[in-house]
Amino acid sequence: MAANIVPQKVEDVDTQALSPMMQQYLEIKRQHPNEILFYRVGDFYEMFFDDALTASRELELTLTGKACGLPDRAPMCGVPFHSYEIYAARLIAKGYKVAICEQMEDPALAKGLVKRDIIRVITPGTVIESSMLADDKNNYICSIYTRKVRSRWKTGICFADISTGEAYATELTAEKMGPAIITELCRYMPSEILINPALLDLKEVTNYVRQHTHALVELREDACYQQRVMEDAMTAQFGADWRNTCGFAQDGLVPYAFGALLGYLHETQKHGIDRIKSVQNYADAQYMRLSPVTRANLELTETMRGREKRGTLLWVLDKTETSMGKRQLRAWIEQPLVDSSVINQRLDAVEALYNANVTRADLKEALSHVYDIERLTTRILYGSATPKEVKALGDTCVYLPQVRQLARQCTTPLLQELSGAVDPLEDLLDLINRALVEDPPANLKDGGAIRAGFNAEVDELRDIMHGGKGFLSQLEAKLKEETGIPKLKIGFNKVFGYYIEVSRSYAASVPDTFIRKQTLTTGERYITPELKELENKILGANERLLVLEHQLFADLLEAISAQLLRIQRTAFAVAQLDVLASFAEAAVQNNYVKPTVDDSDVLSITEGRHPVIEQMLKGSLFVPNDTTLDETENRMLIITGPNMAGKSTYMRQNALIALMAQIGSFVPASSCHVGVVDAIFTRVGASDDLAAGQSTFMVEMTEVAEILQRATKSSLVILDEIGRGTSTFDGMSIARAVVEYICDNIGCKTLFATHYHELTSMDQDVDGIKNYNIAVKKRGEDITFLRRIVQGPADDSYGIEVAKLAGLPEAVIKRAHAVLRQLEATAPGANKAMQLDFETVEAYNNPAVPSEVVDKLNSLDIETLPPIEALNFLYELKQALK
């Protein structure tokens, strides 16, 4: 930084000493202290003082200085106005807000200081620019209003995507409000969250948002949630009958959340929030409950390691053709249904498209020409759409009748309903085709966007401009003849306009009517009254034409905006058709079958496959497996077997198949019957939560606790290696207690994988438990995982064999075999599959053990010994050793 550039905070600057422009800047900046101000100066957006310091650091821009009226220059940096979106996007991604301050008049016509004002504030949840948004993902802003009503938490929560006009809302009433709110946040994954002060008391929610999301949190004052403020905002947006229009309950809290959201949008967007025309109310019980842990473990939309799409369920099912369809597919995966009738409507539609190969192919071809009209309509409403984008809307309209007709060929109720919702928008197509040229410019100011014949004045001005060139040629020929100067020519530049240029050798032939304007080394430049008159006519026509084209294009945008609801309904229908066709295409390509979905308690899968792994292993054989779960004889499957054998894959595939069925997709199996599950819970894998100061075991127990508190009889629970994060006896005791609690108190369908082979005896004590294991083929000291699940407990843990496969040194493997043989010889009655901790191994190898203790150990039947008796026995041994 130069020595004469002194960083100053805006609040410390002496306003009176500043230049007029910097006074204007400071006045606007003080109204937006929490945003980085992009202040338009000519062809740049400039930033000053602390904003300049922040932006130069975050955007890696050169920091310079600007004379501002103070003894020292103000810190300054800037970005070109035509590429500001790139820089704004980077700031937004880092959690900043950006206020766009625009010149409100033409600087060339301004008298004195150019008028400037904020046209909008860009925040993470209010982005509409296509270059700043992911095509396949919605960008939601969330508003939460929560309070205690008679010692019980109640919450109104809503989500809106202003780039598409979608809005959703629900009322929450729960004893444990934290998990309920987190579940809703997981459904929509907002990039910005507005909260009222009372939410700060729900530490579970604030911790989740801080540690597991990238959302910007905006704390709104209680004044934003006052009844009068709420009613004014809702009335302004939806009319006096807003409560009926939106379907809000009389005593609900959603209106307060939505009113605060509208107030925030008015503050930041200034205009364009008319895009939100309606609100879709839903009940949290309308969708399958999926905790953040479950969503991550099942890798629905992003992988756990790389946070990538490849390797997820979304990646497998995405055969969509449109951006709208991609966003809808993601939403369906994030929100599986629990209403079997709605699920079956989707499945019937997918089946119809699955069976109609030609229709499906033609439909996908037509959809491939459909533009992202959801987001385009928002830019049209904001007035920021380009002529090329509006022409893309027209091009889309060409294919809408075909989309409608192809969907109508399938007679299922859902496809008939969606085909009827597709509006061909023929009037808009006609208007756009009449108004715009076939290949309009990307930028309106380049001119030439309006089609000939659309407006008489435009045609007249163009004739003048085009004819003007002919007039200039005629005038040049006339002057050459009159003056006898053969090399006389008429030219143009932006400084002098049109001029007559004559070389020095013909200076004596120049008539007195020529008025000298510029002297060159090679000659002189002149004007004449006739040339000046022609110049005014031509240049005036060009300026008037640009102004007129701008006005006509604005009128076109307004006319399209008036049809917003029609376009929005069509976009929603097209998106759903795209997803249904995608499901059908995935089913054909991947050999899926239509599942039977009903309200029974059955999960029966024949030859089920993991939808993702089988695609990742293309060219390799994926071994299918059967599953039978219900709420009576097969409530819980206890699965044993070595690591790497495929237990986790098997359990996850069952959860994914159930979820796929409940979003309306065909599934990877030869047959499948899914009784609707209201929630899927998973506890898979081990990981520390260092950010929260929690160990692996604490994380595991916290997740198990949530499952035991929230699972119902209709849930599907996946538990993998419960209790392995602590000592053997502690872990085994906890695992057994969890199994008993699920069977006795919840009764839900459960897959329980464990290394505690002692648990396999529980099938004798608890109804509904069945033992299964992953088949292994052993030859000498080598093993082969067959990946096939078979009934009965595992007969060995194969830990040493797995260690060998993992690449442990041969010396370690040999020593492990020797220790194992010694242990087996010392404890001949022990179960080979029993998992022993290191202390137990040392005890068996200790040659100083008294013979009385050895005798007691040899007489012990470990297989039938309950955990509590084992602890008492150990205590007696310890006393004997003293």
Model region roles, listed by residue range:
Residues 2-352, 361, 365-381, 385-477, ...:
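Charged catalytic and DNA/RNA-contacting regions of genome-maintenance
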Residues 49-52, 152, 251, 321-322, ...:
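ATPase nucleotide-binding head domains, primarily ABC-like/P-loop NTPase cores
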Residues 101, 124-133, 272, 408-414, ...:
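Active-site phosphate-binding and catalytic loops of NTP-dependent enzymes
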Residues 103, 273-282, 478-491, 585-607, ...:
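Long, charged, glycine-rich C-terminal linkers/tails
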Residues 225-235, 288-294, 304, 395-474, ...:
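Amphipathic heptad-repeat alpha-helical coiled-coil/stalk segments that mediate oligomerization
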Residues 382, 386, 399, 452-453, ...:
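Charged, surface-exposed helical/loop "interaction arms" that form contiguous linear patches used
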Residues 437, 520, 524-558:
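Extended, charged coiled-coil "arm/hinge" scaffolds of SMC/Rad50-like chromosome-maintenance ATPases
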Residues 850-882:
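C-terminal tails and terminal domains of large nucleic-acid-associated
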